[in-house]
UniProtKB/Swiss-Prot annotation:
The chain crosses the membrane at residues 3-23, 34-54, 65-85, 141-161, 174-194, 227-247, 253-273, 312-332. The keyword Transmembrane helix applies. One of its GO terms (cellular component) is plasma membrane. One of its GO terms (molecular function) is polyamine transmembrane transporter activity. Induction: Expression is positively regulated by the oosporein cluster specific regulator OpS3 that binds the promoter at a 5'-CGGA-3' motif. It comes from Beauveria bassiana (strain ARSEF 2860) (White muscardine disease fungus). GO terms for biological process: intracellular polyamine homeostasis. MFS transporter; part of the gene cluster that mediates the biosynthesis of the bibenzoquinone oosporein, a metabolite required for fungal virulence that acts by evading host immunity to facilitate fungal multiplication in insects. The function of this putative MFS transporter remains unclear since its deletion leads to increased oosporein production. It is found in: Cell membrane. Belongs to the major facilitator superfamily. It comes from the Eukaryota. This is MFS transporter OpS2.
Length: 350
């Protein structure tokens, strides 16, 4: 069931980001993408709060029933409130393939059910693997890599909070453990509201400074315009927050100190993720959903591995060295920003 839930939810991020890229111009896309990813980023942070309350009051099975109710409400909302936006569905079916009749008139040839079935099967089983070819593009691969590293840290921190604060010297109850995720959630909210506007402002500023204008006098944007201080500052902040969290929890310092720094982690991490995702829609113009789907593939694969390894690593080397290592990896990986600033304007090919 978790496998099916993961597959279904991953499509929302890819299709949703592609829709945002189609509806919003480049100059406002960062703002729109920030609001869109407020949901995916807040989900893993808000759910422990709700889950902690349900578990404390009704037991762990209540979390599963809560997920069923929530899923049903979302499904009903999609059926009755979400309009169809596909031009093919709105305007009618595609015209059938035509052939010449004996009298010279063109007659439509209906497509057989078998033919439609194999075409649909090919789209489901073959086309997704062809997308992996886009990863041969260095700009696309580097963007997906850095977004995946930051998202894996996001999962590791969430698991570490639960493990660390449920044991001595803290020993918090389930409901309190859930509330500990609030600062990180607040950081993600601030990043989604402010970060997109910041990124759009930086892009407009860089295009104007470079003197790139079209015939109408409007700035001409490039993906590399987004890689400025709006990327460098959070690239320093969120690894620093990981480092502080690791050492303060290792020393058993009062819970307020390590939990407050999770706000800065959520802020910096979400800024990086939103900027990277927005940039992906511009590196692969016209195929934004493909780019975001590749990003989902990389980040979820890495996050899965990180989730499996977190508990053994915490037991073996402790929070201090695990988060020190993560901070070093993230700081070293931030060199991707420098590379993308210089080499991200060439569109890749599959």
């Amino acid at each position: 069931m978790r496998f099916l839930a993961g597959g279904a939810s991953a499509s929302v991020a890819a299709v949703g980001a592609g829709t945002v890229a189609d509806l919003w111009e480049v100059k406002r896309r960062g703002t729109a993408m920030g609001y869109f990813f407020l949901g995916p980023m807040l989900g893993p942070l808000v759910s422990p709060i709700i889950g902690g309350i349900l578990t404390q009051r009704f037991g762990w099975r209540s979390t599963q029933w809560g997920a069923v109710v929530y899923g049903g409400l979302v499904w009903l909302s999609m059926i009755f409130l979400l309009p169809e936006t596909s031009s093919k569905a709105v305007k009618g079916k595609e015209p059938a393939v035509a052939e010449n009749s004996d009298d010279g008139n063109v007659q439509p040839v209906p497509e057989s059910c078998v033919s439609r079935f194999f075409k649909a099967l090919g789209r489901m089983l073959v086309e997704p693997f062809r997308l992996v070819g886009y990863l041969r593009s260095p700009p696309l691969f580097m963007t997906c890599y850095y977004a995946s590293i930051s998202f894996a840290c996001y999962y590791i921190l969430n698991l570490a909070i639960q493990r660390t604060f449920s044991r001595d010297p803290y020993s918090f109850r389930a409901i309190i453990l859930g509330l500990l995720y609030i600062p990180s959630a607040l950081g993600s909210i601030v990043a989604s509201v402010v970060g997109g506007r910041w990124t759009d402002y930086v892009m407009r500023r860089e295009a104007k400074a470079a003197g790139r204008f079209d015939e109408s006098g409007n700035p001409k944007f490039r993906p590399s315009d987004r890689m400025c201080e709006n990327a460098w500052i959070p690239a320093f902040v969120f690894p620093a927050a990981l480092l502080v969290f690791g050492w303060t929890t290792h020393e058993g310092i009062f819970w307020f100190a390590p939990i407050v720094v999770t706000f800065f982690f959520g802020l910096g991490n979400s800024l990086i993720f939103n900027t990277a995702t927005t940039m992906l829609t511009e590196i692969l113009p016209g195929k934004a959903s493909n780019a975001v789907a590749l990003n989902n593939l990389m980040r979820n694969t890495l996050s899965c591995a990180a989730a499996v390894a977190t508990d053994p690593l915490l037991g073996a080397i402790g929070t201090q060295w695990l988060f020190t290592g993560l901070a070093v990896i993230c700081w070293a990986s931030s060199g991707v920003i420098w590379a993308l600033k210089r080499h991200s304007d060439k569109a890749p090919s599959a």
